[in-house]
């Protein structure tokens, strides 16, 4: 469902017809013969853009908007769900892993500088010159990124594999500064309160 909501297409409905009987084809494509439409090596079930309605484009065409635009955290889980675990349920991500990846992905979202862009936002692509995948606009200007670390012992720091994109009026929450606090359905109202925000003022970044 996460793949479908974010990309507006089904991860298994590609161009491959497994049987001339529609009912049998549906059964095979969703079961025994199920194959991820963006599988990196098996292209059997690739989407055929020429068969799509105009209303399904560009979202329906993975060559235009590949699942990698969802960022590294979700990309990793999509691989486990639709490649490693498609026919091996034990290899699929847990609900907690999906929740954690969604939170981390939200913190990688940055605004598109094109006022006419229909998407308005996109996930940082981890390059020095990020470009909006929806309208093609390259980001101009400073783009600070916070990398989070924790100290398992005095003087020792380890990466949390967690980053926060900084943009004007970006908000800092307690779970960004305290790894014992998580952003989920159990987060208390007190922990949901912002603890700071970033502003670009007089050509400088400040944290209030």
Walk through the language-model features, giving the residues of each.
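Short Lys/Arg-enriched alpha/beta "domain-start" segment
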Residues: 160-162
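Forkhead-associated
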Residues: 165-208
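Terminal C-lobe "cap" of eukaryotic-type protein kinase domains
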Residues: 74-109
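Cys/His-rich microdomains that often coordinate metals
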Residues: 116-126, 139-142
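Short cysteine-rich clusters marking metal-coordination/redox-active sites
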Residues: 112-117, 129-135
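Anionic-ligand-binding alpha/beta catalytic cores of soluble enzymes and soluble regulatory domains
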Residues: 144-158
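Short Cys/His-rich micro-motifs in 6-15 aa windows
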Residues: 134-146
